[in-house]
């Protein structure tokens, strides 16, 4: 390193330390990127910049990596720890020169040829200031926007104004030893490395800032000038007998209603504001598997985020997480109900585009919306939409609305230049601000329209909301999905877009189910959900602190022994710490006596806990059935358990969006039985599986596990009993009568869960019965009870509470519910 460079690093050290806040992406570089701190490291940056090097030094200090400003000694020779592709752009010249880095790499490869024990890691690092994507017509604000190789004067203003938005993005380490062994050590290999690095940095910039922003005129011309929209305008003019100009003006108004107006400045302001809010209301945000989206972006994929929808907070939380994981914030599909002043304008500038709840019958609106979405895909913008169509009121996933997925596939048919990947996202909370209004809606109250009053009321009520959880599920490569399900899908590219191919609906339905199962596969266990599940499974909804702590610990140990999936996450903390943090959320009554503390839901708030329990109920479906069988029969065999799972799993799979196939579910059950035995939640006598002894400390946990699926089984029993009573019944009548009986049982037995008699949940189960051929169909569409269905009813009735079983038997025999 020259004396001039050392002097500049010393001079700018304190100004940079004062002005710059370096954000490292990712934080866990060893695990995610394979960087070995014990081996020598050289950092490769795109531009020779003192401030970039100093901000990188701040980041490496935080990550305990070698300093980029120190000299690196290799085989007795000294090298700079930081290499650059290009020099800084001169003040009065339009382009930056290369640094002659090829010669340095050639020398390093020769060094590896001569020293077999040497293994240098080349770590590409992209340093960006701000995340401005650039515009077709630059304005004054673009003078301080970061660019590939700014002059020293421009860099001065960039650091002054964007120093707090500095991002250090590390890439996977490249082994110089591996390259030297595989490709040799001549100059052509160094040239190839430099060329690949240059392309890599371009993609990295694209993934962090996104493509150049569309100007409004360009947007209008692209949408209105498309063949589909022009045909729709002509059809609108002809069918409604209005002038062509009026129909075109209507299409223009739809664009204005729909389109986002992305402003990077608002994103930066929102980042600062949300950081303050999150620090106030959350104890932390846990993010899982973010490396997946970074890898997709690095490979040039168009990314479509499809998260579950728990709360209006989802819009902000997921965008915030994506931004802090080093990705460009997506354009977000939002319901038109959120387009009210001033929130609508803020959302629009944050990347939201608005859609109506239904497009039915409005061909012009449909054409404009489709063309706008296709334009986003083709220009390279990432997109986010909610497959459920609305927020879940019960805490469980809602059957998906397939409209947006269908439009996405139709866009593929018209030709999207890049590979498209759909990324399912699980979002979980320990406290949802809307949960009270959700339960009121389930009880029949009318949904309140979103308004400023609601926003201010929500802000006023901000408090300790515990942890937030965002897990990125396994991506679905849409091209590969279509190849496997519809091998000839490319033949439809030239077909008229208004005509749907016959394969579209079944393919979209399969894709939608795939999305939902991958969301649930990436579930996050948390303290609130586990505590809620335990208390609601107990007979009196009250437990001692010691019992609760033991049960939470036992359940966490069970999922560590037999994970629900590779994508599901378990808290790192102990059961004691998890319970302590959960009790601070203020959802529980805590009473203390001479024997310790008793914990129960706050008065009349047990129903709220069902929401959080339902977030993770699908994880407990199979272990819950296993233990329900063991306790109900006071002992059973593994073969009997496997037969029970084989019968019930297809129904649970449909309702709870479980990812395992039938064979995988049986293998999972087998592994669970072994883990339950090893963990003391089961005991074995000869071939018989029995509950733990009553004096065993795991007994209470096993008992709770046996009760956690009771409401689901009881709901099944209600539907099957009415089918048994009627023998032949229309689907509508079955849903109505099932709802009436379930409501009555809920009142009689004090069931806290509103979804016990929710029409949508009952309908989903009836649909699963039909799909799995438990029911026969009459010519008029009525459902006919079958012998197979009777066998299923007997299995289910044997698992529910005896008093509930007796009540339902009276219904079957006499048609009485009292």
From Swiss-Prot:
SMART domains: PlsC (SM00563). InterPro entries: GPAT/DHAPAT, GPAT/DHAPAT_C, GPAT/DHAPAT_LPLAT, GPAT_PlsB, Plipid/glycerol_acylTrfase. Keywords: Acyltransferase, Cell inner membrane, Cell membrane, Lipid biosynthesis, Lipid metabolism, Membrane, Phospholipid biosynthesis, Phospholipid metabolism, Transferase. Coiled coil: none annotated. It is a peripheral membrane protein. The keyword Acetylation does not apply. GO terms for biological process: CDP-diacylglycerol biosynthetic process; fatty acid metabolic process. SUPFAM superfamilies: Glycerol-3-phosphate (1)-acyltransferase. It is found in: Cell inner membrane. The keyword Lipid metabolism applies. GO terms for cellular component: plasma membrane. One of its GO terms (molecular function) is glycerol-3-phosphate O-acyltransferase activity. Pathway: Phospholipid metabolism; CDP-diacylglycerol biosynthesis; CDP-diacylglycerol from sn-glycerol 3-phosphate: step 1/3. It catalyses: sn-glycerol 3-phosphate + an acyl-CoA = a 1-acyl-sn-glycero-3-phosphate + CoA. A motif (HXXXXD motif) lies at residues 308-313. It comes from the Bacteria. NCBIfam families: plsB, PRK04974.1. PANTHER family: DIHYDROXYACETONE PHOSPHATE ACYLTRANSFERASE, GLYCEROL-3-PHOSPHATE ACYLTRANSFERASE. The HXXXXD motif is essential for acyltransferase activity and may constitute the binding site for the phosphate moiety of the glycerol-3-phosphate. Belongs to the GPAT/DAPAT family. This is Glycerol-3-phosphate acyltransferase. The lineage of its organism: Bacteria, Pseudomonadati, Pseudomonadota, Gammaproteobacteria, Alteromonadales.
